[in-house]
Amino acid sequence: MSKEELVKKLTEVGINGEWINPDKYGFSRTFQFELNGQIIKIEWFCNYSTLMIGNAHFWFDRISTYSGYPMQGEWIEFSFGNEKPLHLKVKESDKE
């Protein structure tokens, strides 16, 4: 997944952030955003990336903006290979 594809997927569900800690050439691998008051970072590489929430780190190589997670609200799903996905709630349901 390219850096542009990563940002596009996050933007589709209303997640806006910024590339932080650029090197001396202006290149950054770390995308940071805030979700529900918590700072979340993604360390990007084209073959897989790492989602970092505090001390918890999750590898992923796919992002789905259509999550089948059975809880109310809008969710984004991060998955790696055939492993179980990680679901992040990005928006409360209108019914909640």
What role is predicted for each listed range?
Residues E92-E96:
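Short acidic DE-rich linear segments
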Residues M1-T30:
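Negatively charged, low-complexity tracts enriched in Asp/Glu with abundant Ser/Thr
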Residues I20-P85:
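Acidic, low-complexity, intrinsically disordered interaction modules
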